[in-house]
Amino acid sequence: MSRAIESVAVIGTGTMGSGIAAASAAAGCRVLMLDLTEEAVDRALGQIDDEHRHLVDTGTIEDDLGKISGYDWVCEAIVEDLDVKRELFVRLEELRKEGSVISSNTSGIPLRQISEGMPARFLEDVAITHFFNPVRVMKLFELVPGEDTSDEVIDAFASFGANQLQKGVVHAKDTVNFIGNRIGCFFMLSGLHLAKPFLADGMNQETVDAVLSAPVGLPPTGLYGLIDLIGLDVMELVGKNLAVNLPDGDTGHAYTEFPAAEQAMHDRGQLGRKAGGGFARQTKLDDGSRHKETFDLTTQDWRDAQAIDLEGVPSDLGEVLFEDSPAGSLA
């Protein structure tokens, strides 16, 4: 039988879960948003446009998990911890309705690990549905089947992603970090290490971000700005996942841990935008303007953000890679 997705239950209402819920509501679906606390769900409701609020029901995982039985797609979007995910999926499988589809928004944990020991119905109905942050803006939607996932389930997810959510669906294999994050996380984690000599030679972090953005075909956030958006807590979990799952001899093993300065930031809760600042922060002044600051990795202190001067740096990828300059060497 064909599977139609007309309603979506999202478990976990953090940055990604709230984004998936908002996109689904905007597509006209009934949406259920559940998290550990009512406060977390209330914050996430701010992502839902007023015109779509009537489509959204909310609750807590402890009190309202049974509500998922009324939804076509059950989407897990909780913390990147395999044991926690597996524990939740056992509960979800007991409660979801026959004919529903179920997925994880994990950014890189293999589906075979999530599915280990689960019943046949789960194995046939489960997939990875990996969205990218921010969900409303990013077109990429990775769809990863398990060994036993049925074709009709994959077709349902692909159709919903392309037609209702207007995403570009990329079919990926069940390998660590799939496609996007296998490339992107290597860039970010290795970039933290490989930028160190340039910082030591006097290049500031703003210039690192500027070079590692438009000139090399990457988002304007650059390196540090992108990690600020994702969060150092998420990146640390990604690194641990890579350390366990990368093949022996893979170059990525050299970069699965943070450099010392970035690890210290993580340990004191300086995680990024969601924590009030990571590598950068903004403060609203009395006159309404914003004061931008950068956390200097060399001095380990906040300073005023510096203007960027990329005069003479080529904007074409092929040229900047071979530019005889610090910017070219960094790229």
Task: Set out the residue ranges of the language-model regions.
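N-terminal glycine-rich phosphate-binding loop for ADP-containing cofactors
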Residues: 1-331
